[in-house]
């Protein structure tokens, strides 16, 4: 049985990355960066458990990709690490950052082979530039660049973090207890992804796949007297609306499901449940804007959408162009990429009896192409 747990930290909000897409969700081929990193480590060593630390929103989606252990991050890297360590029972723990995405196998093996040398095994690089501290030159032979992953004795690392003092890495925490830290050779390949320009320094990351991802959405709402009718964010001049927990914009609801389906993010009921009173009477355009944000930050680009509205009443032809531009604006795409069709049910069924409306929606997504940026 392996005696090492792997912890990969990725709960940061990518502020310095300066992109709409979280760096954890940039795609390499057909998998997001965090999964590329996890699978790379998994292929290089036998671990008792792999723990991914991330935000609650991301964890919900990550679970669709792989069966790892997921832990909610904290306000700081140290808080995130403490959360991850709570259920670690192996003798050793290997901690790295998802942003450290091109760690070579030889570097991992050097770290693991040295496990009995000290309480913490740390990969380092020499400094080749001249260094000053304020106005005083430093002896660069005494300075090292510290990298991750770092291997620690689990019990020691847990004890070291039981303090209010903040540490920038595991070795600093272990060293603060007077425990021995052992250096091994690091690697220039293990460059950390901090800004978008760093992507050029990461040869192990492939360009995203050019595959198109398609999702389908369907929603149905009955009419209700005395409510305002809104379709695609456009008010329709009739004296009835839709019976619903929110404003009942059946077209936007179908579109949200299509977008979520293409991204593999579940459905509208999971993200915006009708049991949550905060969505009572909610403006559906707000829900769509939030869905678009989720889609973009998780590595997707919206291509085109196609919607079919089945309605015996009201007559929608006068509103189609306005609805098209409303959806294009909400999706932040060009109007020609939005197609809206309206048809009757030939007086058949509940739609034909003018009891409600059904909407079908199809949405196409592609992976965000960071290679072209």
UniProtKB/Swiss-Prot annotation:
Kindly list the positions annotated as binding a divalent metal cation: 219, 221, 253
Annotated region (2-C-methyl-D-erythritol 4-phosphate cytidylyltransferase) at: 1-212
Residues the record annotates as the site (Positions MEP for the nucleophilic attack) are: 140, 192
Keyword vocabulary terms for this entry: Isoprene biosynthesis, Lyase, Metal-binding, Multifunctional enzyme, Nucleotidyltransferase, Transferase
Tell me which EC number(s) this protein carries. 2.7.7.60, 4.6.1.12
Q: Which Pfam families match?
A: IspD (PF01128), YgbB (PF02542)
Its recorded reaction(s) are: 2-C-methyl-D-erythritol 4-phosphate + CTP + H(+) = 4-CDP-2-C-methyl-D-erythritol + diphosphate; 4-CDP-2-C-methyl-D-erythritol 2-phosphate = 2-C-methyl-D-erythritol 2,4-cyclic diphosphate + CMP
Question: Which portions of the sequence form the region 2-C-methyl-D-erythritol 2,4-cyclodiphosphate synthase?
Answer: 213-373
Stored InterPro entries: IspD, IspD/F, IspD/TarI, MECDP_synthase, MECDP_synthase_CS, MECDP_synthase_sf, Nucleotide-diphossugar_trans
Site (Transition state stabilizer): which residue positions?
16, 23, 245, 344
Enumerate the Gene Ontology biological process terms: isopentenyl diphosphate biosynthetic process, methylerythritol 4-phosphate pathway; terpenoid biosynthetic process
What cofactors does this protein use? a divalent metal cation
PROSITE patterns per UniProt: ISPF (PS01350)
Ligand binding (4-CDP-2-C-methyl-D-erythritol 2-phosphate):
219-221, 245-246, 267-269, 272-276, 343-346, 350, 353
Q: Which GO terms describe its molecular function?
A: 2-C-methyl-D-erythritol 2,4-cyclodiphosphate synthase activity; 2-C-methyl-D-erythritol 4-phosphate cytidylyltransferase activity; metal ion binding
**Pathway assigned to this chain's UniProt record:** Isoprenoid biosynthesis; isopentenyl diphosphate biosynthesis via DXP pathway; isopentenyl diphosphate from 1-deoxy-D-xylulose 5-phosphate: step 2/6; Isoprenoid biosynthesis; isopentenyl diphosphate biosynthesis via DXP pathway; isopentenyl diphosphate from 1-deoxy-D-xylulose 5-phosphate: step 4/6
Summarize the protein's role. Bifunctional enzyme that catalyzes the formation of 4-diphosphocytidyl-2-C-methyl-D-erythritol from CTP and 2-C-methyl-D-erythritol 4-phosphate (MEP) (IspD), and catalyzes the conversion of 4-diphosphocytidyl-2-C-methyl-D-erythritol 2-phosphate (CDP-ME2P) to 2-C-methyl-D-erythritol 2,4-cyclodiphosphate (ME-CPP) with a corresponding release of cytidine 5-monophosphate (CMP) (IspF).
Q: Which HAMAP family match?
A: IspDF, IspF
What does the sequence similarity comment in the record state about its family? In the N-terminal section; belongs to the IspD/TarI cytidylyltransferase family. IspD subfamily. In the C-terminal section; belongs to the IspF family.
Q: What is this protein called?
A: Bifunctional enzyme IspD/IspF
Organism whose genome encodes this protein: Sulfurovum sp. (strain NBC37-1)
* Gene label: ispDF
């Amino acid at each position: 049985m392996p005696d090492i747990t792997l912890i990969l930290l990725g709960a940061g909000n990518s502020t310095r990355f300066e992109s709409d897409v979280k760096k954890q969700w940039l795609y390499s081929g057909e998998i997001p960066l965090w999964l590329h990193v996890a699978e790379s480590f998994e292929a290089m060593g036998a671990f008792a458990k792999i723990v991914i630390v991330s935000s609650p929103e991301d964890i919900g989606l990550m679970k669709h990709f792989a069966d790892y252990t997921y832990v909610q991050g904290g306000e700081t890297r140290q808080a995130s690490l403490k959360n991850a360590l709570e259920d670690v029972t192996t003798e050793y723990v290997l901690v790295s950052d998802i942003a450290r995405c091109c760690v070579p196998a030889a570097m991992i093996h050097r770290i693991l082979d040295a496990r009995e040398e000290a309480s913490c095994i740390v990969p380092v690089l020499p400094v080749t530039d001249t260094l000053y501290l304020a106005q005083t030159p430093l002896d660069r032979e005494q300075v090292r660049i510290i990298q991750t992953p770092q291997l620690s004795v689990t019990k020691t690392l847990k004890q070291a973090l039981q303090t209010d003092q903040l540490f920038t890495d595991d070795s600093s925490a272990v060293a603060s207890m007077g425990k021995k830290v052992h250096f091994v050779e690091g690697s220039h390949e293990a460059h950390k992804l901090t800004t978008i320009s760093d992507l050029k320094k990461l040869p192990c990351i492939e360009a995203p796949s050019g595959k198109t991802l398609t999702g389908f959405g369907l929603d149905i709402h009955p009419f209700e007297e005395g409510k305002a009718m809104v379709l695609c964010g456009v008010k329709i001049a009739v004296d009835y609306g839709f019976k619903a927990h929110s404003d009942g914009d059946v077209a936007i609801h179908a579109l949200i499901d299509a977008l979520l389906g293409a991204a593999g993010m579940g459905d509208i009921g999971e993200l915006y449940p009708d049991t949550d009173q905060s969505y009572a009477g909610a403006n559906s355009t707000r829900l769509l804007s939030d869905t678009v944000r989720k889609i973009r930050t998780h590595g997707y680009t919206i291509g085109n959408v196609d919607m079919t509205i089945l309605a015996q009443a009201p007559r929608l032809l006068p509103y189609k162009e306005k609805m098209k531009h409303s959806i294009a604006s909400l999706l932040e795409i060009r109007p020609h990429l939005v197609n809206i069709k309206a048809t009757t049910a030939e007086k058949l069924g509940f739609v034909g009896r003018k009891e409600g409306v059904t909407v079908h929606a199809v949405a196409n997504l592609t992976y965000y192409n960071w290679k072209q940026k």
